A protein has these predicted regions:
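Acidic, metal-coordinating catalytic segment for phosphate/diphosphate chemistry
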Residues: 7, 296-379
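Short Gly/Ser/Thr- and Asp/Glu-enriched loop/turn motifs at secondary-structure junctions
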Residues: 92-96, 127, 135-138, 271-275, ...
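Polymerase palm active-site segment centered on the conserved acidic dipeptide of motif C
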Residues: 113-137
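Residues that scaffold, gate, or flank divalent-cation-dependent active/transport sites
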Residues: 1-94, 98, 116, 214-216, ...
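Compact, charge-rich alpha-helical regulatory domains located at protein termini
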Residues: 122, 134, 145-221
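DNA-contacting surface of Y-family translesion DNA polymerases
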Residues: 182-325, 341-343
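Catalytic palm subdomain of template-directed nucleic-acid polymerases
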Residues: 98-118, 148, 185
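A residue-level signal for conserved active-site and pocket-lining positions in enzyme catalytic cores
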Residues: 44, 54, 95, 132-133, ...
């Protein structure tokens, strides 16, 4: 999907349609854009850019707070549309899906793509556009979809079709990796494709280079997304405090919101954690420092009450009269594992009971303890 988050905001709010729009995690000048509309990109505004810089580039840019639940709803609608067109659909991210064309002949590729775009337009809205790439594997198809944006359609039949691209245009190659490849005399995509498996492995310094050799040649056994972990081993959030929150009271308010967000993600991924780390950094005119504390390591727990109590106890260990002003706060749940892999105590309630409790308690917690609402009220 093209500029997924900002397109949803434009679709659901007429005043944003065809206007430069960026989406931010919270409404403050001290954050960055997580999405930018194509109208905003025309002014040089892009994802990852600070709000202050975006406003400098175009003072009238619309700054919209992210609404994750709306994006999930639109994602689910999109997946249902795809399942009507294809037998097998693999979700790569909230705005990326890979579809199997095994039962569709090559002469029907364009018609199927046009039909899919039409359904997205009718059911999701005129602001929602997608770029479709077709190739032998997911990696090449992703590259193809990025070649003509927005609302593009591209077929890549061979790695030779990529020769006109820059190395940094390929997913998985950033500026740091590009410099590393340059040291191995790899300056273009053609240079990359001309090397054998052993040479690429040497250039990467790991087996990843060998995987690239096969991905570039359309291999399905070594493809994009196959080597990313589905379940995070840590879940963390950090926040730089805005000027009006640089007090211990303000820092604690943000700290509570971060804990709630972390617990939300534990529930979302159905994870248990063994340890909680917290930190508060501070600055003064002459010095700076950071307080870091960790909870005792436990067998594993997904109990929200337990972790909230641990968070409060850890916060109490931070001196109230710190030498400077609070600058940032952060939390991190570590050693996470899937709930189904937790060894339960013989004296605890069965897992189904905990699931039942979450089923009925979670909606209340979201309604009355929404961390996003806490940010809105405090910033």
């Amino acid at each position: 999907m093209n500029s997924f988050y900002s397109s949803i905001e434009q679709q659901q709010n007429n005043k944003y349609k065809k206007q430069p729009t960026i989406v931010v995690p919270i409404l403050t000048d001290y954050t960055c854009a997580i999405a930018a509309s194509y109208e905003a990109k025309a002014y040089g505004i892009k994802s990852g850019m600070s709000v202050l810089e975006a406003v400098r580039k175009y003072p009238l840019v619309n700054v919209v707070e992210a609404r994750p639940m709306e994006y999930v709803k639109m994602h689910n609608k999109l997946v249902r549309i795809l399942h009507r067109h294809f037998n097998r659909v693999k979700v790569l991210s909230i705005d990326e899906m890979s579809c199997d064309l095994e039962d569709i002949t090559e002469d029907k590729y364009f018609n199927v793509s046009a039909s899919l775009k039409s359904d997205i337009y009718k059911e999701l809205g005129e602001c929602m556009s997608c770029s479709i790439g077709i190739a032998d594997n997911t990696f090449l198809a992703k590259v193809a979809s990025d070649m003509n944006k927005p609302n593009g359609f591209t077929i890549v039949k061979s790695y030779k079709d990529l020769y006109h691209l820059k190395l940094i245009d390929l997913p998985g190659i950033n500026t740091k990796m590009q410099k590393r490849l340059n040291k191995s005399s790899i300056y273009t995509v053609e240079d990359l494709c001309s090397l054998d498996e052993i040479s690429l492995k040497k250039a990467w310094g790991s087996v990843v280079g060998a995987r690239w050799f096969y991905m570039l040649r359309g291999n399905l056994d070594c493809d994009y997304g196959m080597y990313y972990k589905d379940i995070p081993t840590t879940i963390g959030h950090a926040h730089v405090l805005p000027p009006n929150m640089k007090t211990m009271e303000g820092a604690y308010t943000i700290f509570e919101a971060l804990i709630c967000r972390g617990l939300n993600r534990l529930t979302e991924y159905r994870l248990s954690a063994k340890k909680l780390d917290i930190f508060l950094s501070w600055k003064s005119k002459t010095s700076k420092g950071c307080y870091k504390y960790s909870s005792p390591t436990v067998t594993s727990s997904s109990n929200h009450g337990y972790w909230m109590n641990q968070a409060v106890e850890l916060w109490k260990r931070i001196p109230y009269d710190i030498q400077g002003k609070p600058f940032s706060v952060g939390i991190r749940f570590t050693h996470t594992i899937n709930e189904k892999d937790v060894n339960l105590s013989l004296f605890d309630l069965p897992l189904e009971t905990f699931d039942m409790k979450k089923k009925y308690l979670l909606p209340e917690r979201i309604s009355f303890g929404n961390p996003d609402r806490m940010f809105n009220e405090t910033l």
